[in-house]
Amino acid sequence: MRSCGILQGKALLDELEERKKRKIIKTEEIKVLYGILTFYTMYDLEKFNSLFDYAEVMQPNIELITDEFVRTAYSGRIKEGLSYAYLMQDNIDKSREICHEILNFKDDKNCFSLLRASALVYLAESYTFESYERASWYINKSLETLELCQSERANRRKENVLNTYAFIKLVNRQGLDSISIYHPAEESFFEIVKGNYKKAEIILNNIKNENGSLKPIEYCYLGLATNDITLLEKSIELFECEGNRFYCKFPKKMLVNLSKNGTMCEGGAK
């Protein structure tokens, strides 16, 4: 359901709970599988602070699985979620450590290519505000890894990786001649970088009309497009409520720039 994109977020969580009520779960593997799906639902809902406690509860159950491949696969899923959660908490060193643990999995038959691709793109993200060159290297490695996978899920992941790369390029003002964007929010950011503020504002208002509200990063973009400090402050507040300290650095940096200079300066957050 999740990998096919049929259900995500709260809808998936509700469906999982309903299925648990209807079925008697007999094997440890199935119990853990349901747990991992719940774990990933928290991930989809960006409940990063809850992931750590849930992973701690699940890990002993994973260790009880006797099949080595299944145990490694399930453990990898937990590590994937934790690496991203640590990144969002701005615990960059811990996030990178877990990503490298995933990359060191024994995988002679390339069964864990999607996991490795995730680890590589999270490593790239971790360098967003630190090193464009290292971020680019990891992005390209992630894309190379995804070429090993022939599935619709891999194709969607590739688009997500490229969109992440677009954000990294825009933050660092590099590689803009070869940018690929798959989300209107980053389209608006691109227009801001080019100085087309009104066009960016229109894109963001369309997103708001369609979705009913904006995401934290989208409020940041709107604040930049309109030179509205209160929107940047709202972006910061929403990021902090989510426990997302990593991306919160960006609107904080932009707020300083706008407060001092009345405009967005070149370069990313530090």
Curated annotation (Swiss-Prot):
Domain of life, source organism: Bacteria
InterPro entries documented for this protein: AimR-like
Keywords in alphabetical order: Plasmid
Pfam families: AimR
NCBIfam families for the chain: lysogeny_AimR (NF038310)
Protein name: Uncharacterized protein pXO2-35/BXB0035/GBAA_pXO2_0035
Species of provenance: Bacillus anthracis
